[in-house]
Amino acid sequence: MRSRRTATAAAAIVTLALSACSGSGPASPAATDPGPVSSATTSASVGASSGAAAGAADWPTYHGTMSRAGVSTTMPAASGTLRRIQSLKLDGEVYASPIVVRGLTIVATEQDTVYAFDQSYRQVWKRSLGSPSPAEERQCGDINPLGITGTPVYDATTNHVFLVAEHGGSVRHELYALDVASGRVAWSKSVDLPGVSARDMQQRGALAIADNRVWVSYGAQAGDCGNYKGRVVGVPLDGGSNVIFYSPPTRRGGGIWNPNGPTVDAAGHLLVVSANGAAFPGDAYDHTNSVLELDANAKVIDSFAPTDWAANNQGDVGLGSQGVALIGTKWAVLGGKSGPVYVLKQGDLGGIGGQVDVKNICLSFGGAAVDGGVVYLPCTDGVRAVRVDDAGQLHVLWHTSDSITGSPVIGGGRIWALDTSAGVLHALDPSTGRSLSQVDVGVANRFATPALYGADVIVPTLAGIAVVRAS
């Protein structure tokens, strides 16, 4: 039976009054005609027939699915030497993971620009959505300029790609629905909320789709400056006005910021992770430093927090840095900023201190990948493989090189993970963690994670994207 330890927790659920300038009608940011990407470089000749195979499984969201498993079941077996077949220089840094939809690779940059490339990585369309926010407009932060950071998501029912762009001037966050075939803006809507300063909020988490809504999560700028509170905002897929949101009932903080964004379970519920909040030892529980399960109305229906959640708040440690990884419909696994890795029971998260197992394994930042009962964690001292047995107990299987810290994905019989500082993609042996092959792709942000499509590994970099052919 599902725990209701948090059923009485207050959830901020409102219908937002949206500004007239950001209604659900079509918008018209400047478009660019299809053509070659300027400054693109290619390390191997790629003809029209050499792109990812037609019919290869799409990768329409962060780590491929709303469960964030990070697995391609159609990628052919990786063999031989990895080849970087494309290095495409775009107009800004790429923090978001690429997504792949109907054979189109969609890439968003921090310049508030979105590109679509065909299976031979030729540009199909390019859409400029406006001007990003420069660093001088914000009190803190580590991205300059700040444009599109959260990974977009595709919805097959509307045929739209959804993404959030931060715009400069009067800092604001705008949700866009783009037609996937043309890049045309179908509608856009402000997703800034009352009670906080837009310039102090950052939209880093990947967008998700559940219950006919697109879900957008918010945390703070790097440095936790100003007036911010964590948010999860749900917007109807048609851009309608019935916008709902959840915010932890804390005075300040509780950012829901990890790049994984909401994880969606088999019931269609959102599993989100709130970071440090304002409640310290002796204060009442405020749903920070927690895993929160939200229903279709953005109400908290279950939660988990470590027994030391309040002390973690005080020390700015604990949970928040890694998204929830799901093992089937039984277990949920996550690490954080301190070292403990937790196993929780799906459907009964356990409340405060109610984990099934916890072991001190590593500091984990980003999104994990899951294959069977094994979770591959993005540890700051190197990816680890951790098995969860039938009783929910953790067993570390291997630990790769301490420089390979990127959020991993799985396909073609390999674990794909980045040494982001060196700009190197590694193909790891799933059994041992040994690097079987590697290739230079260019320096990437610390949270960078690839997309998989056909035989290709598509890597976001600080210059654009690199494409590696794995077989």
Language model region names:
Residues 22-37, 43-471:
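Noncatalytic, solvent-exposed loop/strand surfaces
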Residues 1-10:
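Bacterial N-terminal signal peptides that target proteins for export
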